């Protein structure tokens, strides 16, 4: 039985190296003026200049959660996942999502499947308050068994409102926003462990929470120093806010039961769990310590389950109460 994500077939380190090889070719593919890149180290979305602001763009897919959702006849929500994985990245740079397009690759045409995917995509865009502008459908039986779903989101942010992590400082408060489950990461390992229990299955395929409305409300009221969308790599996403600091999580959010079950079932080491899954933590917000109470009150009014989970310290990396 697989005890790590790599043993299940996904080597995060190898994936990072492959991505770096791709990104290394990007430098010459730029322009000047409108469309010129605005570089963010480890940013969650790409930014290009446009007038007095910046266009934010990101692309992502749902991954092998699609297979589990298909097995459990829950395909009506994977469109929400697809939107969420993109718009939650956009807001990390301060951008408001405006438009979304999808890409569906199919082994064979399937009208019922497409209707379910479309319903989820539309619901996700409603939750994110962005326009579902179109997309592309490709029937490619030589390439795909079943189907795949991905999408691209575009947003806008004024130049002065870009969140680049430069305001992060020692003693900043870290606020955690609860996830709705594994969201859309770790499913290659999850599928190796899942035993068919319907109650657990419902937890595992719950759609990824969309934080757009609550975070945009927070950005309008509080000076946010940085945001991190906790996706693939788990806690490793926190230093993406600014790698020059140490992120101390000494009061973590409760771990949902599904993660406890996965850990026991697979006999997975805690460090591997926190590297693979969000463990109940969907988004992290860094604010000045003096703004933490007001930020928590606002997030509660917006319907988020949020709490003070830690602080920023001198150093590098992440310290977590469950791993010390």
Label every PLM stretch briefly.
Residues 11, 60, 171, 229, ...:
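Residue-level signature of catalytic and energy-coupling elements of molecular machines
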Residues 168-198, 202:
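Acidic, glycine-rich loop-and-beta core segments that form the ion-binding/anion-interacting portion
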Residues 62-65, 158-161, 182-184, 235, ...:
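Short, acidic Gly/Pro/Ser/Thr-rich loop/turn segments
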């Amino acid at each position: 039985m697989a005890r790590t994500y790599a043993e299940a077939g996904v080597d995060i380190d190898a994936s990072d190296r492959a991505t770096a090889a791709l990104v290394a070719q990007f430098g010459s593919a730029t322009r000047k003026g409108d469309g010129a890149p605005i570089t963010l180290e480890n940013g969650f979305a790409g930014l290009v200049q446009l007038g007095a602001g910046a266009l934010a763009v990101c692309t992502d897919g749902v991954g092998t959660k699609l297979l589990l959702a298909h097995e459990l006849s829950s395909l009506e929500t994977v469109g929400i996942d697809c939107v969420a994985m993109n718009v939650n990245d956009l807001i990390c740079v301060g951008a408001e999502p405006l438009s979304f397009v999808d890409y569906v690759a199919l082994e064979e045409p399937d009208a019922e499947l497409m209707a379910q995917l479309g319903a989820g995509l539309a619901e996700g865009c409603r939750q994110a308050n962005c326009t579902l502008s179109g997309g592309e459908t490709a029937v490619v039986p030589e390439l795909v068994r079943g189907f795949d779903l991905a999408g691209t989101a575009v947003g806008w942010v004024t130049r002065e409102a870009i969140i680049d992590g430069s305001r992060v400082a020692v003693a900043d408060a870290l606020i955690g926003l609860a996830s709705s489950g594994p969201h859309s990461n770790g499913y290659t390992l999850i599928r190796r462990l899942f035993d068919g229990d319907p109650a657990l299955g419902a937890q595992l395929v719950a759609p990824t929470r969309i934080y757009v409305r609550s975070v945009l409300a927070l950005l309008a009221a509080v000076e946010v120093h940085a945001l991190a969308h906790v996706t693939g790599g788990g806690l490793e996403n926190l230093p993406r806010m600014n790698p020059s600091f140490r992120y101390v999580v000494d009061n973590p959010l409760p771990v949902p039961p599904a993660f406890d079950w996965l850990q026991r079932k697979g006999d997975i080491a805690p460090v591997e769990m926190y590297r693979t899954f969000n463990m109940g933590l969907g988004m992290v917000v860094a604010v000045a310590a003096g703004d933490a109470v007001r930020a928590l009150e606002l997030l509660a009014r917006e319907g988020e389950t949020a709490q003070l989970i830690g602080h920023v310290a001198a150093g590098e990396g992440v310290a977590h109460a469950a791993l010390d």
